[in-house]
Amino acid sequence: MAWNGIPVVDGDGHVMEDWDALLQYMPEPYIKSGRFKGRIFPPLDHLHSASLFQLVPGAFRQVGPEGWLEFMEDVGIERAVLYTTGGLAFGKVITLEFAVDVARAWNNWFADTYLKKSPRFQGLALIPLQEPQEAVKELRRAVTELGFCGAMLPSTGFKGHLGSKEYWPVYDEANRLACCIGVHGGAHEGLGMDT
């Protein structure tokens, strides 16, 4: 689990969400609506869906915590910082209440499925930056109650740039909690590739 005596940490691992299991963490009206079969987040972008590159068979499959632990053993990784995959498009969620509910559901699902399974997993929570005060609350809950090491912010989709003053309370709370904030690319609209 070390290379030349240095522990190996995967700082950008991605879980493939189990959508059916995740849906069970959403408030009852979402479950009953039947609208969220197979996916909760918006699609990343057309750049990903229209690409003709070939994937290795089995790539991007949902392996769960057992598959992750097996992989980590096979390649000698001591710990992994795990991110959402579907949630890379979380910035595109426009309904504030839905953003809050999805963040809470994803964080609860991930904590139950991964963080409680092994201390070798570290997680970056989703926080609803669409409503900064709610993001502060969810960051605090994710770190202090669920055991996340910080939060992930999608790089695109929000109304202001990530340095906007409206988001400063989130960064102040992260500083107070001594936790990390990771900004992760994934959705590419508005970055010059679509003009």
Show the residue positions of the predicted features.
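Helix-coil boundary/capping segments in enzymes
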Residues: 1-195
